[in-house]
Design a protein with these regions (language model features):
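Nucleotide/phosphate-binding catalytic cleft detector across ATP-hydrolyzing
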Residues: 1-132
Length: 132
């Protein structure tokens, strides 16, 4: 079985401490955004991700939490990382009509097996057909 075949939508995600970079086969880099998420504390909804959320760091009302969920190469906030990743992948899939893509995710080297599984589940919940 080929990991990245010629007849499917394949996405690569670099889940970095500073930025998340997303590529689509044949299109190159389609997203390079800060690894930041803003979450409504009352209901857990995503308010913003990436550059928009970065602008909110230290400037949000009490009911909104803007954070960098990855710190020093590890996942510092497990839930926020899941929400951020899911939101960004859903946006890319919609914007580029990626349907249910196969996704390869590069994760920080220091994450635990539980965190790795959570990243995989987040990508699947975002609509991926397969995650590697």
């Amino acid at each position: 079985m080929k990991l990245l075949g010629w007849n499917s939508k394949d996405i690569g995600v670099d889940l970095g401490t500073a930025n998340i970079i997303v590529t689509i086969k044949g299109k190159g880099i389609v997203l390079n955004e800060p690894s930041v998420v803003a979450i409504d504390k009352n209901n857990g909804d995503i308010i913003a991700t990436g550059s928009e959320a970065k602008e909110m760091l230290g400037r949000t009302p009490d009911e909104i939490l803007a954070i960098r969920p990855l710190k020093d190469g590890v996942i510092a906030d497990f839930t926020a990382t899941q929400l951020m990743l899911k939101s960004m992948i859903q946006k890319i899939c919609q914007r580029y009509n990626a349907g249910r893509p196969r996704v390869v995710v590069g994760v920080p080297s220091g994450i635990t097996e539980v965190e790795e599984r959570a990243v995989e589940e987040s990508v699947m919940q975002a609509g991926a057909k397969e995650v590697y």
